[in-house]
Amino acid sequence: MKKFQGIFTVMMTAYDADGGIDRRGMAAMTRYLVDSGVHGLVVLGSNGECPYLTHGLQKAVIDAVVAECQSRIPVIVGINERGTEDAIAMARYARSAGADGALAALHLFYPLDEDAVFAHYEKLCEAVDIPFLYYNFPGNSHLLLTPEQIARIASIPNVVGAKETIFDVDEVRALVDATDDDFSVFTGRCLNLTQTMEVGACGAICPLPNVMPHKAVLLYESLSEGNREIAAPLQADFYTVGPLIAGSPTPHALIKEAMRQLGHDIRVEVKSPLPQLTPQQVSHVHNTLVAAGLLDD
């Protein structure tokens, strides 16, 4: 049986006026997503601005979400450290705080061969007793492994899944085929949830369910039941909101602005050096939400 499956929302990180973590805001987003029926939460993912948060801010995010969630659904913590020692330290904190899993990326500064990458994950998993997911995001991490190489990492005992933020559905299929049935292969994009579930993916780890959580859950459930008649228009709805993430390599502020326009009390500021929202992007977000039927013009 798979440890994790379904719609896991990559949460945005909410700040207060002083740049600290808005714990009330994080708690409110947690309640909203849990009540919307998503199957899990991911904090400190790539859309949670993790690479630009101090360890203190990261810990505050973990604490706020785990405390509010109260084990109603799993909370997975993004581990995005360049060095193995720091990755171990943050994974240990996540476990001690009550998180249910860790999504571990390895962002390269120096090129590493397959054995060095494997050794990093092996040391991480040996040091911390928590379920790990491998994060395959070559566009950001600059680490490009084949499905067979990822399957080798999957052989480490407490690696239970992988997030595949890639466009090639055949690579997702190859990873599914190369791993055991209880290994959870997630797509990192709701935009290809239909195609990836057709080849064996077990759900999505994605930020777009912040905007349409109910539809994301219904899309997943419809695909799981083989009901393409219901799934097809829901998948099309995600294509409509796709410009929120597809229109920028740094969509963090756009997604926050979408949430703000939909009534969530969240500041749209992001951590430097991420770009702040422009007036043109505010209009772009509004027009996208109108086109998706989520706002009136």
Question: Which sequence ranges carry the predicted segments?
Answer:
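Active-site beta->alpha loop and helix N-cap motifs at the rims of alpha/beta catalytic domains
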Residues: 2-9, 14-144, 259
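Short capping/connector residues at structural and topological boundaries
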Residues: 17-20, 114, 150, 275, ...
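Short secondary-structure transition/capping segments
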Residues: 53-56, 89, 114-117, 145-147, ...
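Catalytic alpha/beta core domains of metabolic enzymes, predominantly
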Residues: 126, 138-239, 245-246
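C-terminal alpha-helical cap/extension of soluble enzyme domains
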Residues: 6-13, 32, 36-38, 198-201, ...
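Short helix-capping segments at alpha-helix termini
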Residues: 67-73, 96-98, 128-130, 155-158, ...
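Alpha-helix N-capping/helix-start residues
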Residues: 17, 23, 55, 147, ...
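A general structural signal for well-ordered alpha-helical segments in protein cores
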Residues: 26, 58, 62, 87, ...
